[in-house]
């Protein structure tokens, strides 16, 4: 029965993997987390890699958008353009470490995280 469905095209691992990739991208997940989530569904590594390549998504910009959204959620609409004098370097370092851990937990590589945090999301007033 399942073989008939697969032969007819009703069951297609490639389409399913692409759907899962798009769904995870919409949630703001990075490629590492997406690979893990899809692998848990039982799809092969080749199928997962093909789906990730087919999306041709800019993971660096997704990481940057995720960092900005998190900063806005935490601090509100970005209006502050400089660090207050009362904040020490230690507090700034702790906050940056939190941001790094958050983005890593969302499935972004360290290189993507560094790109995303290379700017101050509280200074970016483009939106």
From Swiss-Prot:
Cellular component terms, GO, for this chain's entry? cytoplasm
Domain of life per record: Bacteria
Determine if Cytoplasm is one of this entry's keywords: yes
Keywords linked to the UniProt accession? Cytoplasm
**One GO BP annotation here?**
regulation of DNA repair
Which InterPro entries does the record match to this protein? Answer: RecX_HTH_2nd, Regulatory_RecX, WH-like_DNA-bd_sf
Decide whether keyword Metal-binding is in the record: no
**Localized where?**
Cytoplasm
Q: Report the family membership.
A: Belongs to the RecX family.
Explain the purpose of this protein: Modulates RecA activity.
Name assigned to this protein = Regulatory protein RecX
UniProt organism field: Shewanella oneidensis (strain ATCC 700550 / JCM 31522 / CIP 106686 / LMG 19005 / NCIMB 14063 / MR-1)
* Name of the encoding gene: recX
């Amino acid at each position: 029965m399942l073989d008939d469905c697969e032969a007819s095209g009703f069951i297609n691992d490639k389409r399913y993997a692409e759907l899962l990739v798009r769904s995870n991208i919409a949630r703001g997940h990075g490629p590492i987390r997406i690979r893990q989530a899809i692998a848990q569904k039982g799809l092969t590594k080749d199928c997962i890699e093909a789906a990730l390549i087919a999306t041709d998504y800019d993971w660096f910009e997704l990481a940057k958008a995720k960092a900005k959204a998190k900063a806005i959620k935490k601090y509100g609409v970005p209006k502050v353009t400089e660090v207050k004098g009362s904040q020490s370097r230690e507090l700034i370092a702790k906050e940056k470490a939190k941001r790094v851990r958050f983005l890593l937990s969302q499935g972004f590589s360290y290189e993507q995280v560094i790109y995303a945090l290379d700017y101050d999301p509280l200074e970016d007033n483009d939106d």
